[in-house]
Amino acid sequence: MRQKIKELNTIKGRLGEQIACEYLVKRGFIIKDRNYRKRWGEIDIIATKDSKIHFIEVKSVSVSDCGQVEKYEKHKPEDNVHPYKIHKIRKVVVNYLDEKSSSGIGDFAFHVICVYLNFVSRKAKIRIIENIIL
């Protein structure tokens, strides 16, 4: 049973990340990396737009009605991006910038994209929390 739930959460997470990537590309972002991992953490999406690097954490949840996302605000997906997770993300961001940026640390931003998935209607709704301070 636990294995089944873990598999479903993995599918939900991957689908949410794919939807978030498509959303970003439609808005002019260029996806540079996905699931950039280091032993202390991971960043779901790394994209660029207007000479700025955007680090994005994606949180996906299943809902019964994408039109009424406000109903699901009791448990917000972004609540899972707690201070310890932000600390780990900060370490990964610094490592990425050291590793990939030839001109040193440039302009960057960190965002959380919440993807609300309705598997019955096969629809999704996206909400973005931009420019979170690391």
Show which residues each predicted segment covers:
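Acidic-basic catalytic patches of nuclease active cores, encompassing PD-(D/E)XK
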Residues: 1-34
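Conserved catalytic cores of phosphodiester-cleaving nucleases, focusing on short active-site segments
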Residues: 24, 43-67, 71, 89
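Short beta-strand
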Residues: 34-36, 105
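Short acidic/glycine-enriched loop/turn segments that link adjacent beta-strands
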Residues: 38-41
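Catalytic cores of nucleic-acid endonucleases
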Residues: 60-117
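Short, low-complexity, polybasic intrinsically disordered segments
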Residues: 114-134
